[in-house]
Structures are given as C-alpha cells and as structure tokens.
C-alpha cells in the first residue's frame, strides 16, 4: 500500500490520558438518502502521538499507518489548531 493511498482525517482530540496515544473524534456530514437532511456522524479513532504534543480540544490531522496495537491504526501528522484555555 502506497503512503499516498492512506486515509487522512482531521478531527478534535477528545482524550489524551493514555501515554503516547490520543483519541480523535472525526465528524462527517452525510445527506440522508430518503429525507435529504444533512446528518452528522462522529467516529473516534485512537492515534499514536510519539511526543505527547496534542492536548484535549486541539484540531489535529491523523494518517493511516500499520497496526500499532489492538486499536491503534493511525498516527498524528500535525496539530492544525491548538485549543484555547480560558
């Protein structure tokens, strides 16, 4: 599988409690086939964060990679936008 063929998602970090692992919620908008209404779907992915740079609330980009554990199939590419702490 080529590196360019791999899936790349952008989502929000919802958990960073594990060491070197983040949970990213990716939201997609799909039009309902019968009713035509736009429906939001959210799916959570566990991603590898080698240096623990991503924090809860950050917008990050993750890319598909080889299986790193039972659930981890993605790695952190970049932090697109850092969360604002008030």
From Swiss-Prot:
Q: Which SUPFAM superfamilies match?
A: Nucleic acid-binding proteins
Which keywords appear in this protein's UniProt record, sorted alphabetically? Ribonucleoprotein, Ribosomal protein, RNA-binding, rRNA-binding
- Signal peptide extent: none
Extract the Gene3D superfamilies matched here: Nucleic acid-binding proteins
Assigned protein family:
Belongs to the universal ribosomal protein uS17 family.
Name by which UniProt lists this protein: Small ribosomal subunit protein uS17
Keyword Ribosomal protein attributed? yes
Summary of the function given for this chain in its UniProt record: One of the primary rRNA binding proteins, it binds specifically to the 5'-end of 16S ribosomal RNA.
GO MF term list: rRNA binding; structural constituent of ribosome
A GO CC annotation given for this chain: cytosolic small ribosomal subunit
Record-level GO BP terms: translation
UniProt feature coiled coil, ranges:
none
Naturally occurring in which organism (per UniProt): Exiguobacterium sp. (strain ATCC BAA-1283 / AT1b)
Per UniProt, subunit arrangement is: Part of the 30S ribosomal subunit.
